[in-house]
Amino acid sequence: MKDFANRIVYYESSRMSVSVRLCLSSIDKRVRLRDLTLVKEELQFFLDQKVPQVKFIDRTFNCNHQHAMEIWKYIQEHDNGITNFHFEISADLLNGEELALLAKMRPGLVQLEIGVQSTNLQTLEAVRRHTNLDKLRHAVVRIHSEYNIHVHLDLIAGLPYEDMGSFIRSFNDVYSMRPQQLQLGFLKVLKGSYLEEMAQTYGIVYQSCPPYEVLYTKWLSYGDIIRLKRVEEMVELYYNSNQFTHLIPVLQSRFENPFAMYDKLADFYHEKGYFVHTPARAYRYQVLLEFAQQEDPDGMELYRELAVYDLYLRENAKSRPAFAWDDKT
């Protein structure tokens, strides 16, 4: 059993029919719930073993209010100070009682993955998601205000009716919610899914073998998909890494919108032939400052200061980085 101390456990407490896009009722009989007594026994085992993370794979964990509350109360009351629990939820379904309970959680006890997918209402309707975006935003703001829960927000490129302009709006909408992680994914047309049935109607062309990822649609060309892949890489490097938390917001403010900065940064990497997959963090700082020099040379003194601040905030650097100003008097 010692192996559990170094493993992520994937766990399921409920199962939803593949045909159900979003569970709207806590008494929806298409959702099968596991016995809560058994669930609590199993969770206690993981807690006793000090598992670093238990990742719930329930498709919409909080579609049943009572079920979600019982589990959240249990992990809050039996917190071992080590184990983290990851849940995929629909934030617009959260009510006041759930939000109040989440606010009491130890920082780091819970992280939430919220599948926004798109903020285009026509797109959401086409994929049978009935998300109340205003409620979703309100819930995310409320969760953020407590500073105790790590929030992931997910977008999916390649959905029906989402052209480049629409996707850019969705990206900027989600970015404005300031998640700790912004996951930019690409549609996967799974066998037997609704979108497989509708692929021809929507002009969705996808890979013929796993992961069956979208190649292009009526609304997004193959070139658009490649462009978004590059933007995804920049978001991973410079936003989701949480290594540039002071420099990126200031630099981004010089652009029309967040997407515009990441899009242009992706072009910069591509045109210069710079490596995206490099373990050297100093390299990423250096490239970002070169980009800043190209886009806003008048702001370079501030950008260098912020880069050094971000670096020393996270690194035990033994020497000053090459991009640091000379502090000799």
Language model region names:
Residues 1, 35, 59, 90, ...:
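General structural signal for secondary-structure boundaries
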Residues 1-145:
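Radical SAM [4Fe-4S] cluster-binding motif and immediate context
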Residues 12, 41-42, 70, 77, ...:
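Glutamate identity and glutamate-enriched acidic tracts
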Residues 40, 47-57, 82-88, 106-118, ...:
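Conserved C-terminal portion of the radical SAM core fold
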Residues 233-329:
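Radical SAM enzyme core and accessory elements
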